[in-house]
Regions:
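Hydrolase active-site cap/lid region
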Residues: 27, 158-209
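Short beta-strand element of the alpha/beta-hydrolase
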Residues: 67-76
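The serine-hydrolase catalytic nucleophile loop
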Residues: 77-89
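Alpha/beta-hydrolase active-site loop
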Residues: 112-136
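Serine-hydrolase catalytic core
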Residues: 209-283, 287-289
Length: 300
């Protein structure tokens, strides 16, 4: 039987708040946990298979015997902000963390496309569901959380809307690929930015990626995923960036559909949350603790 999968992106508590800085950060954000000498935390380089390519990945192993839940941390395009600080905070609260690079990015073999990254995400989820993976790394294959930022947030939402085993999904400042061609002025601004940032990408150009998105405009508009997500726990966080309007539209659509559990927070910061990193870690850790309280508990 396939394990239940929980996809998760950084969010705050119920409702929308412009300043989600808590009065006190959780211990996992500000202090190291006690060390289990028999099962200390660790980090290892691994590969994740996808369509004949071994994708480069880093696995942060939580301390303690486990089995531990695992967070799949999806970066953006190309992903200059890898959110490594989030990985460390998440590990301190007792979860493993897997970061990987899509085919054709950051030295991973293959050619990049938006569609191939969708495939890579699904393959990474399958990897974490694999009993052999779970046994080797002391993972609980029924407790997998996916955190997605920017393009990674789009991927998290797409995977959740197409996989009925995903019980919860969250999205951080996600680009809406279905709408990036809709407004000529915004398209020009975004296109220039992408052209300047694709050095780590193999096999793709910014105009080519925009053309690919245009061919999939309807199916890649994440506002249209609201109905598929209505029975899940949905978690959203937005920033003061070019994706703000689409994130608001997704939140409105989810409310209209009567989503069973929607948590939505707005952070007054840039796309990378550059001046709110501690706040972001706090939100992530508190949300994981909230998931634990709802039955997705980690076994320390």
């Amino acid at each position: 039987m396939r394990g239940s999968i929980i996809m998760f992106a950084v969010v705050g508590l119920a409702g929308v708040s412009a300043q989600p800085v808590p009065a006190q950060a959780p211990a996992a954000v500000v202090a190291d946990p006690p060390v289990d000498p028999k099962f200390p935390p660790g980090v290892t380089g691994i590969t994740v298979p996808s369509h004949g390519v071994d994708m480069d990945a880093t696995l942060y192993l939580a301390g303690g015997a486990g089995p531990h839940g695992t967070v799949l941390l999806l970066h953006g395009l190309p992903g200059y902000e890898h959110n490594g600080d989030l990985a460390q905070a998440i590990r301190r609260v007792g979860w493993n963390v897997l970061l990987f690079h899509y085919r054709g990015t950051w030295g991973t073999a293959g050619q990049f496309s938006l569609s191939s990254a969708i495939e890579d995400t699904a393959d990474a989820v399958r990897f974490l569901r694999d009993p052999a993976t779970a046994a080797k790394y002391r993972m609980d294959r029924e407790r997998v959380v996916v955190i997605g930022h920017s393009f990674g947030g789009f991927l998290a939402g797409y995977e959740a809307s197409h996989d009925p085993d995903i019980k919860a999904v969250g999205i951080i400042a996600a680009v809406n690929l279905g709408k990036i061609n809709a407004d000529p002025k915004e398209k020009e601004e975004r296109l220039k930015r992408w052209e300047a940032q694709l050095h780590p990408i193999r096999g793709a150009t910014a105009p080519g990626l925009f053309s690919e998105a245009e061919r999939h405009a309807k199916e890649w508009d994440y506002v249209h995923w609201a109905d598929a997500l209505r029975g899940r726990q949905v978690l959203l966080v937005e920033a003061d960036d070019q994706n703000h309007t689409d994130m608001e539209a997704l939140a409105a659509a989810l409310r209209e559909k009567g989503t069973i559990a929607l948590d939505h927070e707005a952070v007054s910061t840039d796309h990378s949350f550059s001046d709110h990193r501690i706040a972001l870690q706090t939100i992530v850790v508190k949300w994981l603790e909230k998931l634990n309280a709802h039955g997705v508990a980690d076994k320390h």
